[in-house]
Amino acid sequence: LAVLKIVADTSFLMIPGLFRVDIFAELNRILQRRYEILVPEPVVKELEYLSRRGTPSERSAARLALSTLDQMKILPSSSESADLTILEVAKKHPDYLVATADYLLQKRLQKLGVNIIRLRQRTHLMLEREIE
């Protein structure tokens, strides 16, 4: 089986700090195969900004997210926008999954037919469609 590629946005990487959900354990549970998490550069910039300028809970969640980046791969991007970068990557790579807790981004990705990993009931992750 090929290694699954998962593009993560800021909202997804903030889940452990905001909702105390272990995203790695959850990804292992729902995917049951090897995966690599890809983080677009603008997402890293958003996390860095939130770690300095967010609300107290955002700051600690962003710091926690930044501390896990060494287990992920950073995707260089020419765009400043995290959402646009994610949409571009998803269009270019239809087999990639996108992990996001952002409802509006989920809607845009659904229109493209992208398989989404999302947070359910603030307690666990869910895969929108089974992986072929």
Predicted regions and their residues:
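Domain-level signal for Mg2+-assisted phosphodiester chemistry and nucleotide/NA-binding surfaces
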Residues: 1-71
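Nuclease catalytic cores that cleave nucleic-acid phosphodiester bonds
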Residues: 42-132
